[in-house]
From Swiss-Prot:
Domain of life: Bacteria
GO cellular component term of the entry, any: cytosol
Name of the top EC class for this enzyme: ligase
Stored NCBIfam families: glu_cys_ligase
Keywords, ordered alphabetically: ATP-binding, Glutathione biosynthesis, Ligase, Nucleotide-binding
Name of the protein: Glutamate--cysteine ligase
Family: Belongs to the glutamate--cysteine ligase type 1 family. Type 1 subfamily.
Organism (species): Yersinia pseudotuberculosis serotype I (strain IP32953)
GO biological process, any: glutathione biosynthetic process
GO MF entries: ATP binding; glutamate-cysteine ligase activity; metal ion binding
Length: 519
């Protein structure tokens, strides 16, 4: 059912200091919309600085898709307050626009209404926009406007010293990377618990389908909404941000070198489909190259091993240089019940679950078994709250009730929580007690709660109401950690940094592309 972690938990209880110094960061995406919920057609607000070079406020795929990035932080409450300050500042700078509070967009009539993010005239800025042009031409622009939250997580060196016997990060990079790959394999096996608890996209606006074929047995209500009665996260389904053409890349998570080799192969292997699409239409570039992945970031994954890159370094070269530094969790929908899209209960749960994923035994996985794990995710994504729902064990035919597996997992998480809380606090234990109830009563899950309101008011109605409510709330709250002066200084500095990049270019864009485009 779930791996036996009793020995590892006993070890953890004897080494409570090993968990002091966990580091986290959050990235939150949100669409800028007008007062009636339509996608904002304005450019990235001048008052927010330069998206290319701002430390905390940037854009993702579309010019209207904001992305907020926190610095790395050792304290969850501090981290979330920083994120809230960025939201407060932005809410005051958006004029009559709002931040869409749901993962799935609504009110987008046509793909051509979605303007790609622009980053100025520097080669790197134009490269980023062309990469997005490639995404649009490969997968369609609508899929790229789906928003999520990414949770970045790393364990302290003290943990790896006690757990794996390493002395420092550089000499111990193989052991530390092996530990993080173990986490990733367990995440693929058991991470469906995240959409079960926190999936918040059980429905989509019918406009999102835009005539696309789907085999999903959608129910419709009169408010322009398609939903599955027991779904948790359509964002994570094939309708959302997934990429079928990548499922046969053979990428596995057993060790650093085979992972990086497979990733590098994907950015060097031409795809018949993308060769047919072509590189250019007249003078207009259509994509960076015709390979399976234009760049490594195009790999769709619910979790990624990461290391901060140096100038000019690719993500995989950074991993080879220093090993895995942290993990990026990518399966969180926007939390519609929070004005900042994520809350402390979710962060504490992820801490507990990711620690458990490192402690629990995780046999190596072939690419076939990786595909098997997808069945459990799909079951939870599309009908996770269905009475009597079951979870498959590995690639075998045996199954267990989801409720049983969930409760067994939480029995382990409760012990991790006691270690994290120590004698001073009970906040992690409270999170366990609150969330485990969702296995007895699926109506407590985010997806059940939001679907109830959506059936009454429609997705558009719910989105507009929450967007307006959070706009007023954030506009009226004072900043707590950042100051107006700091935010204005970063706005100006970001513009200056972009300007310097534009002045520094010596190559023409065509020359730059020949060097960095991978064709």
């Amino acid at each position: 059912m779930i791996p036996d972690v009793s020995h590892a938990l006993t070890w953890l209880e004897a080494h409570p200091k090993a968990l002091k110094g966990i580091r986290r960061g959050i990235e939150r995406e949100t669409l800028r919309v007008t007062a009636d919920g339509h996608l904002a057609s304005t450019g990235h607000p001048e008052s927010l600085g330069a998206a290319l070079t701002h430390q905390w406020i940037t854009t993702d795929f579309a010019e209207a898709l904001l992305e907020f990035i926190t610095p790395v932080d050792g304290d969850i409450d501090h981290l979330l307050t920083f994120l809230r300050d960025i939201h407060r500042y932005t809410a005051r700078k958006l004029g009559d626009e709002r931040m869409w509070p749901l993962s799935m967009p609504c009110f987008i009539e046509a793909e051509q209404d979605i303007e790609l993010a622009k980053y100025g005239s520097s080669n790197i800025g134009r490269f980023k926009t062309l990469y997005r042009e490639g995404l649009k031409n490969r997968y369609g622009a609508l899929m790229q406007t789906i928003s999520g939250v990414h949770y970045n997580f790393s364990l302290p060196l003290e943990f790896w010293q006690a757990w794996a016997g390493v002395t420092d990060e550089q000499s111990g990079k193989e052991e530390i990377s092996a530990g993080y790959f173990r986490l990733i394999r367990n995440y693929y096996r058991f991470g469906w618990v995240i959409p079960y608890l926190f999936g918040a996209s059980p429905a989509i606006c019918s406009s999102f389908l835009q005539g696309r074929e789907t085999a999903l047995p959608f129910e419709r209500n009169g408010k322009g909404m398609c939903y599955l009665p027991y779904a948790t996260s359509l964002r994570l389904s094939d309708l959302g941000y997934t990429n079928k053409s990548q499922s046969n890349l053979g990428i596995t998570f057993n060790d650093l070198h085979t992972y990086v080799d497979a990733l590098k192969r994907a950015i060097q292997t031409p795809s018949e489909e993308y060769v047919a699409l072509g590189l250019k239409d007249g003078d207009r570039h259509l994509q960076l190259n015709t390979n399976v992945l234009q760049i490594e970031n195009e790999l769709y994954a619910p979790i990624r091993p990461k290391r901060v890159t140096r100038a000019g370094e690719s993500p995989s070269d950074a991993l080879l240089r220093g090993g895995i530094e942290y993990i990026e969790v990518r399966s969180l929908d926007i939390n519609p019940f929070s004005p900042i899209g994520v809350d402390a209960v979710q962060a504490r749960f992820l801490d507990l679950f990711l620690i458990w994923c490192v402690l629990a035994d995780a046999p190596e996985m072939s690419s076939d078994e990786l595909l098997c794990t997808r069945k459990n995710w799909d079951r939870v994504i599309l009908e996770g709250r269905k009475p009597g729902q079951t979870i498959g064990i590995g690639c075998s035919d045996s199954r267990q009730p989801l409720e049983t597996v969930g409760k067994a997992l939480f029995a382990d998480l409760r012990r991790v929580a006691e270690v994290l809380d120590g004698s001073e606090s009970a906040s992690y234990q409270q999170v366990c007690d609150e969330l485990v109830a969702s296995f007895d009563d699926p109506e407590l899950t985010f997806s059940a709660r939001i679907l109830k309101v959506m059936q009454e008011k429609g997705i558009g109605g719910v989105g507009l109401e929450l967007a307006e409510h959070y706009r007023e709330m954030l506009q009226n709250e004072p900043l707590e950690l950042l100051t107006e002066e700091q935010l204005s200084a970063e706005r100006d500095a970001s513009r200056q940094r972009q300007h310097e990049l534009e002045l520094k270019d010596k190559l023409s864009f065509e020359e730059y592309l020949a060097l960095h485009g991978g064709q």
